[in-house]
Amino acid sequence: MAVEKELGARVTLTHPALRPGSPPSRTPGEGAERSEAGEGLAVPAAFSDPSDIHHGDWVERHLPTWSQPYARLARLDRPIGTWLLLFPGWWGIALAASGWPDPALLLLFALGAVTMRGAGCTLNDIADRHYDAQVARTRLRPLPSGAVTLWQAALFLLFQLAIGAAVLFSLNWASVLLGVAVLGLIGTYPFMKRVTYWPQVFLGLNFNWGALIGWTAVTGELALPPLLLYLGGIFWTIGYDTIYAHQDKGDDLRIGVKSSALALGSHTRPWLFVFYAAALTAWAMAGLAAGLGFLFWLGLAGSAVQLAWQPACVAIDDPADCLRKFRSNRAVGWLMLAAIVAGHFA
């Protein structure tokens, strides 16, 4: 869009770190900028270490040098994404159980979440390697930094997919069919930010598919409760990933990448309340459909408090705070899991 190009040029020319020949960096807060994609869009303030690769972390301290780029491709250094992928699967298992969920299934889904989240991130890095080189947060990732080649990343992707397939084919056939059905969504998600301002919707469709597979892994068939659980998870993901996307909105606007953060701009906060309210409503309907008891509603209330706190307190122009609020969704995952399990007993 013409307005976006103009804004991108203004940001580039007014920040020496973004002039030609300089590495990309975050832009200073120079007041609210405007674009067709988001009224009153503020360019985020700079902060000391925008890169999501942190030298001296446990990967560098404890892993062999040759393995470190692969650990980072799989995001083993940043497990929050694995948790957010894993929880819907655990919820589905717990919702289908008549009491305590099967620990063997929980462990199997944990292995699947680690490998498939790693595979998804590797695929995303392959697709976005040229964009990532221009974004302050991602420019030091293994592909744009040259730590691995494209072929090495592709082979690592196949290795992870093989492990994921082994996990999937250890389940019943209903779960296998669902796992195969989601492959199209997994393959198309990395390209959605090029064509729509709502890639977060596609991420939600992907990340919460485990709710369906978790249920069928126990029961062998789909039903209304996991569908409602899945719907709630989609809205939850749209909310937390919109917060996450606000970290990169300055760079995204400059290089032409789309996100819900750009679409909503200064209207993000009220929309986060809407997304999270929709998630809680769908989860409540799932609990009703599954016949869960009082303790489920107590846990759901705790999740509601946490989800209300995020949009009420998030500083959407502070990338560090956006990351903190995004990571806080692990608490929602645990609260919902505890609520579903406890709801079978009281």
What annotation goes with each model-predicted range?
Residues P28-E39:
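Glycine-biased, low-complexity coil/linker segments
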Residues S67, A71-R72, L111, R141-L228, ...:
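Intramembrane alpha-helical segments
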Residues L86, L106-A113, R129-G179, R254-F294, ...:
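Multi-pass membrane catalytic core of lipid/isoprenoid biosynthesis enzymes
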Residues P44-Q68, C121, D125-V148, T242-G265, ...:
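Cytosolic, membrane-interface loops and tails of multi-pass inner-membrane proteins
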Residues A94-L95, F169-L171, M192, T216-A217, ...:
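Helix-loop junctions at the membrane-solvent interface of multi-pass transporters
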